[in-house]
């Protein structure tokens, strides 16, 4: 599936979560990397819900084919007490923003589950002028009950985000971890100081 619940594996998020790759009915299709990378007709939702197998790290780099310099953290701007699950967020991006898929690469719900969004090799749609060389991570929340900006992350969300960021830094050791606010001061997102908290 496209979800991972923090606590199932400890203490690290398993690399196989990031290395998941869809299975094809014809194994020979794996040999054609260009065909695999250029296929946009099938939505990521259906790809991510197929059976998956682990991919070696070196194969992952062949799949990504882009330089990652930033890991950008976002919030969904959802008030406390309300839900915005992965599929709802994805539908909103497709129907109301005109995207072909959810704009983020990872989405973390309040229960700590990490949902895979866009494939890492695909450019996201989450931070203007910085999408080409970045990975976007969004957590559900970011607003208090009265709709003011606030760090509403649950302990499970914090644990999942930390584990995910550590694994991504293993893959991209030179990438800077920043918040959306650090690149666009007009926005309070992600409603906490990501640079200070994830200085590793």
Residue ranges and their predicted role:
Residues 63-76, 80, 110-114, 130-135, ...:
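Basic/polar, cationic surfaces and motifs that engage anionic cell-wall
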């Amino acid at each position: 599936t496209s979800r991972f619940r923090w606590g199932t594996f400890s203490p690290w998020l398993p690399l196989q979560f990031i290395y998941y790759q869809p299975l094809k009915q014809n194994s020979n299709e794996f040999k054609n990397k260009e065909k695999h990378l250029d296929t946009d007709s099938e939505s990521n939702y259906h790809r991510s819900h197929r059976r998956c197998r682990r991919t070696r790290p070196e194969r992952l780099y062949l799949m990504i084919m882009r330089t990652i310099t930033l890991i950008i953290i976002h919030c969904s701007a959802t008030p406390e007490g309300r839900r915005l699950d992965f599929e709802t967020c994805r539908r909103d991006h497709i129907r109301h923003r005109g995207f072909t898929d959810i704009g983020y690469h990872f989405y973390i719900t309040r229960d700590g589950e990490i949902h895979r969004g866009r494939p890492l090799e695909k450019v996201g749609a989450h931070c203007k002028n910085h999408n080409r060389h970045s990975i976007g991570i969004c957590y559900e929340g970011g607003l208090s009950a009265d709709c003011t900006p606030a760090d509403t992350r649950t302990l499970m969300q914090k644990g999942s985000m930390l584990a995910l960021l550590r694994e991504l830094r293993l893959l991209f050791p030179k990438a800077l971890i920043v918040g959306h606010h650090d690149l666009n001061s007009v926005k309070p997102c992600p409603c906490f100081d990501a640079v200070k908290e994830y200085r590793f």
